[in-house]
Amino acid sequence: MDFRKGEIIAIDKPYRMSSFGALAHVRYLLSKKLGFKVKIGHAGTLDPLATGVLVLCTGKCTKQIEQLQTHTKEYTATLQLGATTASYDKEHSVNHTYPTKHITRQLVEETPVSYTHLRAPR
């Protein structure tokens, strides 16, 4: 691999790490191993609470970032019905639980998703 000429690499961004933090860590590791500062950028951010593929471009491939950002993305989520947390995400422990016996797969699939461009699973 020639990181100076340019490479496109995909990493699995860890939970609680920012996209910039992940990029900085990879830059540090590559620069230390190669003996020179590696030019590196990412083709889109992920929330620190999200995990998933983060596309990194090095060297001359950083010029392709804008084009890579036009590609379709797919998101998946796991949720727990009948539970809340202080922050409404998994950053805090469950603080209240509610009955869920009335929630059926059909009800979930027929309930409109409130976020733009998202759809219920099939």
Predicted regions located by residue number:
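Catalytic/RNA-binding core of pseudouridine synthases
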Residues: 1-122
